[in-house]
Structures are given as structure tokens and as C-alpha cells.
């Protein structure tokens, strides 16, 4: 039976519908937001896989080309592997939903969001999050939702709910916030150096506006929700709890005071092994399963680390809650790279490299909106040796794509306009050591590498990751968190920005949301940490270098008559290809006649410019040209004096004396100077060799 609810959300009309499509899924909802239509389905396994010790949730977001009336390109003419944007939206759906599943629920769950219809004025990400929340609410799974999501813009000092992609171009903010009725769970944003106060109010504005969504999902659930699963959270085994505490608490307390990450991990791993040996069923008829023993040891470590912090005792590495780890910076570390920096903060290290290219190096993206050209790329690579592990090297994983996009958001606001700096920019962050906050190390390293490359950024940018430990009303905000503090804490709160304001904010909560006061304190503490990091960065390099690297391309610009573009390009691109091969340059010609010549050698650029000028030059009567003999006849010779332009030197114009045979004076391929005498009405050109002497 079909059920639906409708509501107004900002400027959009939204309908949630279920009961007609995908009826064999545990939950299925079609979200229609002004003709952007997304089908979201939820399916869960009824049993837990043997030995399962984590929650296997998978979210797949996919855009169908037919949604925008397009046929896919390529040989196969069908959708292939997920694009970067699809991967990012998959993560955006996953992040606010994951923490709301009941503790101990380990059944595999798959959420699929499929874009069926696309209105360019409505981005599919917000409908997808809403649809996932609604489908979960209908499924009967142990999910503590619903949640809602909203996009917030900031135009003319006013907040805008769910602005269109076109409106976002005039907005100083692009923020997505998701949360439950009472608390915020997730924030993803890019901003134009806005204050912490403006950012916080944007989050709260979005949270207030999304209440209508939560109300509507609850209305739909009242009509069509399936019965709740007969599932109960596993009861705590008090005996195992006691055994683990009695035998291993003292060792765990000592282990989590070891500052060196690898030594600490090895010590904790040994404690786990000893616990399994002592309490596991393999060696003890009255023992417990290995996964259960490890779970209880981990839970004890969780309690130890959190309790120490809430009691205001030193953190794992001995710091207080507001101290940033020691920072070291080196720039120009790679002699042939256009710009490079090695940024190390504690045991987290990023080697970041900036490369400058031409417009031809820009990335072309095939999206539902058509082909999009992107002249700024930031790629994040998490190498397995950075955490002392062996791993596969291949295409980037979801996490790497997400971290790269976050770092890019942090830098976009301070990049120069393309008309002021006509380069394609690629930044690559290689994580060579990792112990928390590697994405924010990438922001810092990228800012340094860009300045080292001579990119005229408006101002330096730094990033910092904040953490949270919360028990009841008691909480502690942690500055510059370690990997273990991220793992054992309740929040990952990343802030990037300049000394002026915030450029990117990302927040993920592992508990059932946080309050405005916690966010305010986290932003304030992050501001202090960011200014400290910027101060250290400025000691290494305070402004972009005045000169580009000797190995970076230089641009020379000129303009030609649009009627001459075809002459410069030549048949099938032969002419321009010949110039680039001859000079070793890269040449771009726009439809308006603007020409950009890129070369690492000034002489090569000048040579390419001269060749183009010769092609587009208009012949001038009385001017002397360097010419080449192309054909000899009985009455004279034809010579090319400009690319694509020939003229005749009559036998009488070859020399001051009488010439009986042209071949006695000239040969094909010979180069001589000629003077242009006349261009007749038919465009025929008369040249003279003797007048040029």
C-alpha cells in the first residue's frame, strides 16, 4: 500500500513516498524535492556473521545518467565505478547515520541511494540523507533516528536554507548539517574566512530548520513502519568484566601513559594476547570467546583513557587539553618540484607537493550537469608505512577521497582567481607518518607548498582536529587529538582557516549528538590552536615566493584576430602541433582570440610567439621578409615569406643584372630576403630580391 507525506522545506516542496517501489527491501523511500528524485533502500541481514566484531554498514550513492536525460560516454555506454562526487555523498549519508545504530548491533546493513531524476536547481545529497533516515525509520532496525539534513548558505549577511547550486556561487558559505530532533550529529562545510560565531549560528540555523523533516518522517513511520526487530543488546558479562579489570587494569593504565605510539600499540597488543591466553575458551574450559575477551579489554582501555582526561590528568602523550604537539617545518624539500613542504606535528607527518600546469592539465569531470572543468586538485594519499603496516597500493579509498576533499575545502577560499593566476594547480599530500589529524596536517602542508611554489594565495591556512570526551553533563575538549584519542573519544571536529576566519569545518559525532555550548567551546579552542600553528608556519614561510620555480611553466599571453584562429590551428591541428613540437611549448587558444603560451624557457616562448605572429601577420608593402624558395619557373620563382603566404619574384626582380635562367640564381629551399612590392586586387603578391639588398 502506498503512503506519502509532503512538506515545504525552504523554497522546495518535498514528498516522501513508500509502498510502491522496492517493496522487498526492509525499508524503501522515494524522496522528491522539486523534481530531484532519489530512491533510498535499506536491507539488513537477519543474522550476524560468525566472528563479526564490528558494525558492517555500507552506503552506496549512485547517479544515473538518465536522471539528467543523458547517455553515458565511453565504449560501454553505461555507468561505471563511482565518481569522486558519488563517493563523497556516500560518506555524507553514512556519517550521521552510523552512530545512531544500537551498540552491539553487528548485522550487515546496506543502504543504496539512487538518483532517478535530477533538477539542476536541487542537489541530490540532502534528499539522499533524508531518504536514508526515512528508510531506516520504516525498516524496524534498531536505529535511534530519525535524522534530517539541511544545506545552509550565507548571502548578504543572511542565512539561506537549501540554496540552489547557482545561488551558492554568491554565498560565502556552503554548509551541510545533519542531526536528530535534539542534537547535531554531523557538519560538512566550506567557507570564505567566516568567524566562528557565524559558523556556529549557521549550524544552529540549519538544525532548527530541519525539524520539519523529522516531524514528516515520524508521520510517515506512523503510517507505514514495519514492526521493530526482535533484537536486544547483548547483556554485559559481569564476571568477564571483573576478570579483565582484576588482571589487566594496572597494565592498561601504564600502557596508556606511553607517549610513543608504536611502543604503546605493541604493549596494548600484548595485553590483549595475554588476556585471550588467560581468559579465552581455547585454554580455559570455562573461558570466553576471543572476540568477547578483546572487546572487554578494549572497553576497559576506553574507560581508563576517558576517566583520566575527565579528571584533568595528563593525556596519553603527557599534554594538557589545550596544547598542540611540537611542530617542525621544512620547505623546498624536493629540488625539481614546483613547490614542496614537509610538515610534522608530533607523530603525524605530511610531505606535500604543489605542481603548476596549463589549462590543458585541468581535470574534466562528466557530471549530471554536463562537463565541468576543475583547475585545482588536491589529492591525499595514506601510505601503509605511515602507521608501520603492510598494505596494498592502488586506487584511492573512500577515506582518502574524503580527506583530500576536506583539505581542498580548507584552501579554496584563499586561492587566486584564474584570471589573475592562469595555472592549473595540483597538490598532493603524501602521509608519511600518522598518529591523528593527518587531513589537517595536509591543510597546513598544502598551504606551505603553495606558497613555496609562488602561488599568490591570499593568506596562509592551517588546520587542527579537536576531540571530545563526554560523560553525562561532564565533558572535556581536546586540542590536536592523537589517533587513540580519536578512536576512544566521542567527536572528531576539524577546523581549517586563516588568522581571519574559518575556511572549512567538519564534525562527526559518535554519540547521540552534542550541544551548542560544546560546539562553541570547541570552536574557541580550535581558534587558539590554529593561531598557534599559523605562527609556527609563518616562521618557515610567511608569504608566497616572489618567483616561480625554474621548472614551472611561464605564461606569455597575446591576442589574435578571431578570423585567424583557424590559420594558427591549421588543418587537423597540424600548424599548432608543429609549433609546439618545434618550440617545446604548450599553446592554448580561446574562442575570443586570446592565446596563452606556456614554457619553462623564455626563449622557447618567444620563438612560439614569433611563429604565431608570423602566421597572423598581414603582409605590408615595402617591408622586407625572410623568405624561402618553394617553386622555380621559367619566368621567376615563388617564395613563402610568411607562414601560408607566397609571392612571386619575377625574373627581372632577382638581380641588378640580366638573369637568363632563374635556376642559375635560385634553388628550391634556398632562403633569401625579399621586399614586398605589391598586392593586386586578386591578392597576388609581387616580391623583389634585388630591392631587398
Swiss-Prot record:
MF term (GO), any: 3'-5'-RNA exonuclease activity
EC assignment: 2.7.7.8
> Taking every annotated instance into account, which residue ranges of this chain make up the domain S1 motif?
622-690
Q: Where is this gene product found?
A: Cytoplasm
Write out the residues that bind Mg(2+).
486, 492
Location of the KH domain = 553-612
PANTHER family, alphabetized:
POLYRIBONUCLEOTIDE NUCLEOTIDYLTRANSFERASE, POLYRIBONUCLEOTIDE NUCLEOTIDYLTRANSFERASE 1, MITOCHONDRIAL
Q: Which HAMAP family match?
A: PNPase
What subunit structure does UniProt give? Answer: Component of the RNA degradosome, which is a multiprotein complex involved in RNA processing and mRNA degradation.
Q: Which family does it belong to?
A: Belongs to the polyribonucleotide nucleotidyltransferase family.
Protein name stated in the entry: Polyribonucleotide nucleotidyltransferase
State the organism's lineage.
Answer: Bacteria, Pseudomonadati, Pseudomonadota, Gammaproteobacteria, Cardiobacteriales
Amino acid at each position: 500500500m502506498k503512503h506519502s507525506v509532503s512538506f515545504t522545506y525552504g523554497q522546495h516542496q518535498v514528498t516522501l513516498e513508500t509502498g510502491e517501489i522496492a517493496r522487498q527491501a526492509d525499508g524503501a523511500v522515494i524522496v522528491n524535492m522539486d523534481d530531484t528524485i532519489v530512491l533510498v533502500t535499506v536491507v539488513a541481514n537477519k543474522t550476524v556473521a560468525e566472528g563479526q566484531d564490528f558494525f558492517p554498514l555500507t552506503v552506496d550513492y549512485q547517479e544515473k545518467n538518465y536522471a539528467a536525460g543523458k547517455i553515458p560516454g565511453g565504449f560501454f555506454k553505461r555507468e561505471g565505478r563511482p565518481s569522486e562526487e558519488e563517493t563523497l555523498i556516500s560518506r555524507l549519508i553514512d556519517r550521521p547515520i552510523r552512530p545512531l545504530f544500537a551498540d552491539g548491533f553487528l548485522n550487515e546493513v546496506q543502504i543504496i541511494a539512487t538518483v532517478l531524476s535530477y533538477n539542476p536547481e536541487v542537489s541530490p545529497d540532502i534528499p539522499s540523507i533524508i531518504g536514508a533516515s526515512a528508510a531506516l525509520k520504516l525498516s524496524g532496525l534498531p536505529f535511534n533516528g530519525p535524522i534530517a539534513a539541511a544545506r545552509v548558505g550565507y548571502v548578504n549577511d543572511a542565512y539561506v536554507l537549501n540554496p540552489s547550486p547557482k545561488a551558492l556561487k554568491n554565498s560565502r558559505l556552503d554548509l551541510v548539517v545533519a542531526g536528530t530532533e535534539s542534537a547535531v550529529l554531523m557538519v560538512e562545510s566550506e567557507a570564505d574566512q567566516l568567524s566562528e560565531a557565524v559558523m556556529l549560528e549557521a549550524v544552529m540555523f540549519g538544525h532548527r530548520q530541519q525539524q520539519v523533516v523529522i516531524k514528516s518522517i515520524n508521520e510517515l513511520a506512523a503510517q507505514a513502519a514495519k514492526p521493530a526487530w526482535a533484537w536486544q543488546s547483548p547483556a554485559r558479562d559481569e564476571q568477564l568484566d571483573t576478570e579483565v579489570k582484576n588482571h589487566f587494569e594496572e597494565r592498561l593504565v601504564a600502557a596508556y601513559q606511553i607517549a610513543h605510539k608504536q611502543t604503546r600499540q605493541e604493549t596494548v597488543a600484548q595485553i590483549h594476547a595475554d588476556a585471550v591466553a588467560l581468559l579465552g575458551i581455547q585454554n580455559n574450559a570455562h573461558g570466553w570467546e576471543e572476540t568477547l575477551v578483546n572487546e572487554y579489554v578494549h572497553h576497559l582501555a576506553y574507560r581508563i583513557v576517558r576517566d583520566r582526561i575527565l579528571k584533568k590528568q595528563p593525556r596519553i602523550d603527557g599534554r594538557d587539553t589545550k596544547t598542540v604537539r611540537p611542530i617542525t617545518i621544512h620547505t623546498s624539500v624536493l629540488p625539481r618540484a614546483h613547490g614542496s613542504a614537509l610538515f610534522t606535528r608530533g607523530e603525524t607527518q605530511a610531505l606535500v607537493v604543489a605542481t603548476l600546469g596549463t589549462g590543458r592539465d585541468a581535470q574534466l569531470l562528466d557530471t549530471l550537469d554536463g562537463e565541468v572543468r576543475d583547475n585545482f586538485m588536491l589529492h591525499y594519499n595514506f601510505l601503509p608505512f605511515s602507521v608501520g603496516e603492510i598494505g596494498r597500493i592502488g586506487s584511492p579509498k573512500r577515506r582518502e577521497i574524503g580527506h583530500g576533499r576536506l583539505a581542498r575545502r580548507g584552501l579554496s577560499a584563499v586561492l587566486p582567481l584564474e584570471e589573475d593566476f592562469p595555472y592549473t594547480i595540483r597538490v598532493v599530500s603524501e602521509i608519511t607518518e600518522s598518529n591523528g589529524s593527518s587531513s589537517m596536517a595536509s591543510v597546513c602542508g598544502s598551504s606551505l607548498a603553495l606558497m613555496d611554489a609562488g602561488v599568490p594565495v591570499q593568506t596562509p591556512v592551517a588546520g587542527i582536529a579537536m576531540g571530545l570526551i563526554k560523560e553525562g553533563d561532564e565533558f572535556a575538549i581536546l586540542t590536536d587529538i592523537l589517533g587513540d584519542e580519536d578512536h576512544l573519544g566521542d567527536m572528531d571536529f576539524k577546523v581549517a582557516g586563516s588568522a581571519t576566519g574559518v575556511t572549512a569545518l567538519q564534525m562527526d559525532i559518535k554519540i547521540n549528538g552534542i550541544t551548542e555550548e560544546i560546539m562553541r567551546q570547541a570552536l574557541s579552542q580550535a581558534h587558539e590552536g590554529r593561531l598557534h600553528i599559523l605562527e609556527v608556519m609563518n616562521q618557515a614561510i610567511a608569504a608566497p615566493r616572489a618567483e616561480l620555480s625554474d621548472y614551472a611553466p611561464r605564461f606569455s599571453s597575446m591576442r589574435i584576430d578571431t578570423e585567424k584562429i583557424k590559420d594558427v590551428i591549421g588543418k587537423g591541428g597540424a600548424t599548432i602541433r608543429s609549433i609546439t613540437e618545434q618550440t617545446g611549448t604548450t599553446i592554448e587558444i580561446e574562442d575570443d582570440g586570446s592565446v596563452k603560451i606556456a614554457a619553462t624557457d623564455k626563449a622557447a616562448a618567444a620563438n612560439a610567439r614569433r611563429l604565431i605572429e608570423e602566421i597572423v601577420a598581414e603582409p605590408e608593402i615595402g617591408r622586407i621578409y625572410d623568405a624561402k624558395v618553394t617553386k622555380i619557373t621559367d619566368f621567376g620563382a615563388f617564395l613563402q615569406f610568411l607562414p601560408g603566404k607566397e609571392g612571386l619574384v619575377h625574373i627581372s626582380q632577382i638581380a641588378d643584372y640580366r638573369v637568363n635562367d632563374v635556376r642559375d640564381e635560385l634553388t628550391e629551399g634556398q632562403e633569401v630576403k625579399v621586399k614586398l612590392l605589391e598586392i593586386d586586387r586578386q591578392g597576388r603578391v609581387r616580391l623583389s630580391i634585388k630591392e631587398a639588398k
